[in-house]
Swiss-Prot record:
EC number(s) reported in the record: 1.14.14.-
Cofactor: heme
Protein name per its UniProtKB record: Cytochrome P450 BJ-1 homolog
Xref: SUPFAM superfamilies: Cytochrome P450
Binding site residues for heme: C349
Protein family per UniProt: Belongs to the cytochrome P450 family.
Top-level enzyme category: oxidoreductase
Gene expressing this chain: cyp112A2
Organism: Sinorhizobium fredii (strain NBRC 101917 / NGR234)
PANTHER family, alphabetized: CYTOCHROME P450 BJ-1, P450, PUTATIVE (EUROFUNG)-RELATED
A GO MF term: iron ion binding
């Protein structure tokens, strides 16, 4: 009997956001699977919730930004000073501790009114456009950039500039060569941040750049590490939230009964955001976080050779019935159980409180401001950004 070919990634979502039937079928057969990656490498895909947590918290695995030599891509951001996923252990903890105060509950609460004001401003900008209008251009793309401007302590007017650079870095991150679009954008972004940090010497404040300067002055980080930390927070904090707003809106438009529940009971917004994060997180078809075991390991009875590719399929874990009851049902009243949309372990998303705030502000008010909000095209006509791991859309045309 001929050997069956390995399941191959990516496994594209149905209608851009619904889980892949192939992924669901694989997940039903166990928590870990031998798969083939897009460039032909064999590896492993972890789809079980408990198994994913175990891998993500186990120091026996290298983080995504520290791959073995056989898998090192020509990626401009990997290995860059201050890029958190390219550090582990004590070095990672040192760098993460420096930026943690900027994302503390206290700092995020202080930003709440600003986020609400930014969203209200963008709603009015959208409302002033001729219909149909591109919601991506007027809301989902600028909002996270304007929020990160406030967090970093730079001018709102700069948001379009650095959001564009962030987009270039992520869209072209695997292009090679010293003059690649990604490398040029990354260098320009770092130069921009370097200049803004100089400005903060004369005009400090309660913001991330001032925190980073203080860390440099205390000898806790080099200037290049501080610049890299700021650039990393900007890139990571922008692209994923853009996609999450778009996927969440598409989810609510696809589930009108859930939308009506939210409109009728705005107090459900916290649960609605968690359900959107659980079932419709950012991503396209190869969703997850890579890990590399340093030695041979066994996961759920499966032997994994050292230095193999192990993709922790974060979205797939949300459909594990051992953890979530009726996981394929979108229910904004679901009793909350922890999901892995923000990862787990030492490298969990440091900006998750800020991301949650942005999503709660958007989903807590957009359907009040635009009661008849709807897509201007059929969902299948939306163009998914397949070249970027977070997904999202080229445009998001809407009517209201």
């Amino acid at each position: 009997m001929p050997e069956q070919p390995l399941p191959t990634l990516p496994m594209w979502r149905v209608d851009h956001i619904e889980p892949s039937p192939t992924m669901l079928a694989l997940r039903a057969n166990g928590p870990i699977h031998n798969v083939r990656f897009p460039r032909g490498h064999e590896g492993w895909w972890v789809t079980g919730y408990d198994e994913a947590k175990a891998v993500l918290s186990d120091a026996a695995f290298r983080p995504a930004g520290m791959p073995p030599a056989a898998f090192t891509p020509d990626c401009v951001i990997l290995g860059s000073p201050g890029w958190l996923v390219s550090h582990e252990g004590g070095e990672h903890a040192r760098l993460r501790t420096i930026v943690a105060p900027a994302f503390s509950d206290r700092r995020v609460k202080l930003l709440a009114q600003q986020v609400e004001a930014i969203a209200a401003q963008l709603f009015e900008t959208l409302a002033a456009q001729p219909q149909p209008a591109d919601l991506r251009r007027h809301l989902s793309f600028p909002l996270p950039a304007m929020v990160i401007s406030a967090l970093m302590g730079v001018l709102y007017e700069d948001h379009a500039f650095f959001a564009g650079l962030s987009d270039e870095v992520m869209t072209h991150q695997h292009e090679s060569g010293p003059r690649s679009a990604s490398r040029l954008a990354w260098e320009e972004l770092r130069a921009y941040i370097r200049g803004k940090m100089r400005d903060k010497r004369q005009d400090p404040g309660d913001n991330l750049l001032t925190d980073l300067l203080a860390a440099v002055d205390r000898g806790e980080a080099t200037e290049e590490e501080a610049i890299g930390l700021a650039a990393g927070m900007l890139v990571a904090g922008h692209e994923s939230t853009v996609a999450q707003i778009e996927f969440g809106l598409l989810a609510m438009l696809r589930h009108p009964q859930q939308r009506e529940r939210l409109v009728g009971n705005p107090s459900l917004v916290d649960k609605a955001v968690e359900e959107i994060l659980r079932m419709y997180p950012p991503g396209a078809g190869w969703d997850g976080i890579m890990r590399y075991p340093r030695t041979d390991v066994t996961i759920a009875g499966v032997h994994i050779p050292a230095e193999s590719k192990v993709l922790v399929g974060l979205p797939a874990t949300s459909f594990d019935p051992r953890h979530f009851e009726d996981p394929e049902i979108f229910d904004i009243g679901r009793d909350a159980k922890p999901h892995l949309a923000f990862s787990y372990g030492p490298h969990y998303c440091i900006g998750m409180a800020l991301a949650r705030l942005e999503l709660k502000v958007v989903f807590g008010s957009i359907f009040q401001r635009f009661p008849a909000l709807r897509l201007a095209v059929a969902p299948e006509e939306l163009k998914l950004r397949k070249e970027i791991i977070t997904g999202g859309f080229e445009e998001f045309p809407v009517l209201w």
